[in-house]
Amino acid sequence: MKALLAKILYGLAFAVALPALLLLWAQALDAKYPALSRIGSWQAGVPLVLTGAALILRATWDLWQLGGGLPMNAFPPKRHVAHGLYGWLPHPIYVGFAFIMLGGFIVLRRPAGVWIVSPVLWIGTTALVVGYERLALRRLFGDSLPRPRLALPPSVPEPPRWWHRAAAYVLVFGPWLVAYEGIARLLRSQTGGETYLTIELGWRPVEWTVALYAGAYAWVTLAPLAATSQATLRQFIRDGWVGSAFIFWCFLVFPLSATPRPFGATNWLGHLLELDRVRDTAFCAFPSFHVFWPFLAARLWAGRLPAVVSYGLATLMAASCVTTGMHSLVDVLAGFGVFVAVNRLDDGWRALLRQTERVANSWRDWRVGRVRIINHGGYVGAAAAGGLWLVGILTGESHAGEIMVVAFCGLFGAGIWAQWLESSSGLSRPFGYYGGIFGGCLGALIVQFWRGDGWLLFGAFAAASPLIQGMGRLRCLVQGCCHGRPCPDTFGIRYRQPLSRVCKMAHWAGQTVYPTPLYSIIGNGIIQGLVLRLWTLGAPLGLVAGAYLILSACARFMEEGYRGEPQTVRFGGLAIYQWLALLFVIAGAVSMVLRGPSAPPIEPLTFLPLLYALPFGLLVWFAMGVDFPESNRRFSRLA
């Protein structure tokens, strides 16, 4: 009876309560941000709702009939389901739910639901799949699970089947088109710096080259049909994801545009280009997708055509971006640079892993009497100093006292939190990220009652936190904390330093483990650009802080799924930090709807904040890089 009641409550939570809360959140956000671009059309929304409902109903039926269970992570089916809808599409229930919510927001004319809630839902669902469900399925049913047809093709030399080619359209081109049109509409009213060089402004467009520019659409769209092996098609899909994600990030982060140069159409080709100009936006130009995609497609076409022909055509298409006046030289070179980077993605990742492993085994310490100075303290000291410098630049020169209150509260919170959660006889002075966040929030609350600037400090520290945490992860690498669990050799790094926690506490010396601190560094770099862009746009500080809390929580949830620290507390199938990440998502959602001031303009670069940032950085260096290894007193030892 208790099990049945638990299943009913679980189902109600996700089938009723969650959609209702998302609708209420969208309603509150609409009241807070009335200027969001409105999208409302039942002709577009109803088909999405119906498609989503059909996916959910069919997938639920397949789970019940074939798996002997219902779609509940806490109560998984008895058997793995790889037939029916699950034989074609990965995670059809999540896809269906995303369709229903997006379609519902469109029908109800909730712009915040479209622009904020839906992207958060998609990111959160991805975090759940990557950080929990994917791993749980392997634990339950083994690693050799059947692959849905509309998924990444296997890396084998056999020719692609028709569904492998179809997967490229479902997994890459479809999501890309939705993301591009959405971002283009979101940025259409923005202003930014032009990327044209002075010399380009006098160049007259060449009308006949519109054929090359327009031909790029067919060249790219037909490319999956030219793939000669499943492995090359798999690489095309993966590199399309990575390159598109990076370019979309650039669109959102960098205020750059390329307004098309004047073009006097004299024939149907010219009128076709003018139609494209009307529908597009100058903000979606740097780096140029019109360069990235033709070169990526040329890699597939090179299996059917001579390489010189394939890449030669891609080069002409890239040149047409300039000759038609649609892009600047900078846009074109940046787009080609993205292609070069993703084309060497495997080599670049291996090089990054090698460098990460060097840092992970770079422990050095020096003794001065009973005092030990460890080199990893320099990373976190620099992180603290750099973070406070950024906070000082964002808030202005008159807030030094308030900044130090929040900084000290964050440092003490990190220490107290870790003492409560992770302290052991061999680890008497740990520090914890979430404790630092809680302490910083307490400091911002103190500042609010003291000077009324709590929101300003809350937003500024949120905007600087990715920098602080990202740099601080270098200390994690050297010390061996926040490490991953064992993994295949090609995916990870090895720790060999005897004093590293990986060797001393987890006893995985020489074993390959996931480079989870590296994942965190990359994730924080992505988040840093987004929150700083919100600040420069003068966004409400609650939105800045909320975006950081939600994005960092989703990143941490995914990262935690691959971590392997033995002292981490787990319950309910999740690590405690994953539960905390869920709470931080809720906190971020609340922060976004609270009333508060907007981010002030960033003042010119100043070095005055270094007067307090550097001393605080030295204090953090001492707290996290200097210890007394021969003492058994509390707080004496870092390792």
Residue ranges, per PLM feature:
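N-terminal transmembrane-helix/juxtamembrane module of multi-pass inner/ER membrane proteins
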Residues: 1, 156-219, 263
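N-terminal signal-anchor transmembrane alpha helix
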Residues: 14, 18, 42-55, 159-185, ...
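Active-site-proximal inter-transmembrane loops
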Residues: 74-87, 93, 146-148, 197-201, ...
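Membrane-interface loops
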Residues: 63-68, 188, 192, 227-308, ...
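Membrane-anchoring alpha-helices and their flanking helix-loop junctions
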Residues: 1-83, 95-154
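Hydrophobic, membrane-interfacing alpha helices
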Residues: 208, 213-218, 222, 356-639
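Membrane-interfacial alpha-helical segments at the cytosolic side of multi-pass membrane proteins
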Residues: 96-108, 222-225, 291-310, 337-346, ...
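Alpha-helical transmembrane segments of multi-pass membrane proteins
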Residues: 18-28, 173-192, 383-390, 592
